[in-house]
Amino acid sequence: MTQELKSKLLSFFKFIFATALFIFVIFTLYRELSHINFKETFIQFGKINRLWLVLLFAGGGLSLILLSLYDIILVKALKLKMPLIRVFRVSYIINALNSIIGFGGFIGAGVRAFVYKNYTNDTKKLVQYISIILVSMLTGLSLLSILVVLRIFNASHMIDEISWVRWILYIVALFLPIFIFYTVARPVDRNNRYMGVYCTVVSCVEWMAAATVLYFAALIVDIHISFMTFVGIFVIAALSGLVSFIPGGFGAFDLVVLLGLKSLGISEEKILLALVLYRFAYYFVPVMIALILSSFEFGNTAKKYLDNSKYFIPVKDFTSFLRSYQKDILAKVPSFSLAILIFLTSIIFFINNLTIVYDGLYDGNHFAYYIALAIQTSACLLLILNVRGIYKGSRRAIIYAFISIILIASATIYTYASFLLLSWLIIIFVLLILAYQRAQVLKRPLRFKKLAFMLLLSIFILYLNHILISGTLYALDVYHIEIDTSLLRYYFWMTIVIIMLLVGVIAWLFDYKYKRPHHSIDLTLCDAIIQKYGGNYLSHLVYSGDKDCFFNENKDSFIMYRYKSNALVVLGDPIGNTKSFESLLEAFYQFAEYQGYEIIFYQISDQYMPLYHNFGNQFFKLGEEAIIDLTTFTTSGKKRRGFRATLNKFDDLNINFEIIEPPFTQDFFDELKFVSDKWLDGRSEMHFSVGQFTQTYLSKAPIGVMRDHSGKMIAFCSLMPTYSNNAISVDLIRWLPELDLPLMDGLYLHMLLWSKEKGYKAFNMGMATLSNVGQLHYSYLRERMAGRVFEHFNGLYRFQGLRRYKEKYSPNWEPRFLVYQKHYSLWESMLKVMRVIRHK
């Protein structure tokens, strides 16, 4: 049998053993808990003096400070130049997390190695010392096991009745002398020969502190037994927890304590309550404190420290790669810790709803209590819904949390006024203030998908809350009390109304305060940039007056955009100095992220697609633009006789074409407006991606007009200079609809011939929407669907007809794309673009 196979078999048997043990513990624990009277447990909790609870929780929080002795010994042994106060802070965080997700202490060992390696260049010795600390956590329990075997801590009622307990105690007791002999005989450092002994003493103190906290919890719930006997039971329970490999020994430890105390004639209800209080005091409270410390310990200071650490010098590319992620993780620790604290706060006060309900049952003013219940439930739900926003540093999410904490505090003061809970709310409020000051964004974009998820999550949480309350009331057998049950029925709807009011009012006020209005832009700066660096087929639309412009820091490039529904819809590619485009987009994305806006690019070319890709965007092909090569365009030849026939027809009818240069007279503009109004026939103007029929906009470029034999204007088209590459575009094309003449063909042909005569090289006839989109089997599904629309919905919009019309001019087809951010919906992005185009 190979070594690899042996290793796999050993891992498999370990997994089978741990799983079987876990299942056994769960079933046994379930069987024991099924006999417990939860009503009696709840009543016992109500009788506890709140001052004793505060002292218990304080004791649980302070007990973990003793574990800092491990780190002090480590720092002294390695002679690390690390401030003592920081040693205590880091140690507390490590030990609190290790107690919850320890996995035999390996989590704590890993975090210790990560933190302390920045203070020493002897990594090998550091790892050896950490290994001693890791193993010594068991040696303290081994010392206590010896005392149990010697009956100093008397647990004879368990040892005599359960044979496997005796053998486990013997085995663990033997571990201590072996460990001490080995570490003294073969020390890591001869100058610190007794390192293992010191750590064993600390480990023993650690386990005794945990036993003392549990004993104090037992005394609070009126369990009175000898401390020596109690510690004996605790040691056996702790060994069971270690053997189970479950973090914190959850389940196995509790089961042994329950069985051990129950065999002494103590009621199960009291034991269960003592265990719950112990778990909260020794595990939950330290974790909460550790999360608070993390908010201060790991932030910009830690990141700066890593940058300046003389020991943390990567010697390999892979090390440098890992270091970059370590810095990112450290920077996120404060916001992550606060998010966890907010989530836990919400859970705590959701559970405390039981207290409001219970007190309300026996109070004459039921209505006030259930309003307080609805307010607190709404506030707790808002906290949960904004956990991710707080983690992302959103000011709006933090404001929601502010309001929620105030509402919870108000409900707490009115109902059960717990000093401990109010103190906790004050701490959270202070942390939120600090988070608000360093918040990175105003708000995060609210998308339909996220809104639907939040709605489903809210319903699920409210349902769980209902199950919790109704199940508890049923267990407490309180339904015989005569109350106005309609209040309980309306409680759900009161909660919904309160949430809607809170969310609606805060969102409206926030958007009102930070809404970016449309400002008049500096067209002189746009002119200067376009004249110096050139434009594109859409750059002339900057004069339409319905867009904002975003400039880079050097003021040598800009983009045109419109704000709509929490989105910034950008028209076309950036304009200006191409070397500045990346910095321009980076600044624009930072601005949008801070404001909480989505970014959508409409009608971009494929020239800068790699640049858009660098910003994590997705692409959708909108269609293709028809670009006519004027150097080869002609009306001569057999294939062009249709063009000549059209031109000859207009000549026969004495219909003339001319280009009118600005400035325009008022009479000329009135003629244009008459034709435009007839052509629109009551329809609304399009916006954003086409020009505006305003005197200001039309005065920026020449206009081609066609007049009949009497001099009456019957058609016109406005031009869009591109200011680059000797290209020109057509913009507005309008004619009198009552005339049965090919006026559109006439305008295009005359414009093409005029442009060629003026020396232009290319003429843009505009885009054929959805043209040549999704034609391959390998295309994206969304593009194949768009292709089907192009093929089969020609009656709704003349997709194919538009392309066929432009095909006769033999253009070159250039693709145009919609660019939208990842995790965003294509259809939502398209709808926002359509709203920008359809509405002014």
From Swiss-Prot:
It holds the Pfam family LPG_synthase_C. Residues 30-52, 111-129, 183-200, 251-270, 359-366, 414-415, 472-489 are extracellular. It is a multi-pass membrane protein. GO terms for biological process: lipid metabolic process; phospholipid homeostasis; response to antibiotic. GO terms for molecular function: phosphatidylglycerol lysyltransferase activity. GO terms for cellular component: plasma membrane. Keywords: Antibiotic resistance, Cell membrane, Lipid metabolism, Membrane, Transferase, Transmembrane, Transmembrane helix, Virulence. It comes from the Bacteria. It catalyses: L-lysyl-tRNA(Lys) + a 1,2-diacyl-sn-glycero-3-phospho-(1'-sn-glycerol) = a 1,2-diacyl-sn-glycero-3-phospho-1'-(3'-O-L-lysyl)-sn-glycerol + tRNA(Lys). It is found in: Cell membrane. SUPFAM superfamilies: Acyl-CoA N-acyltransferases (Nat). It is an enzyme of class 2 (transferase). Belongs to the LPG synthase family. NCBIfam families: bifunc_MprF. This is Phosphatidylglycerol lysyltransferase. It comes from Staphylococcus epidermidis (strain ATCC 35984 / DSM 28319 / BCRC 17069 / CCUG 31568 / BM 3577 / RP62A). The lineage of its organism: Bacteria, Bacillati, Bacillota, Bacilli, Bacillales. The gene is mprF.
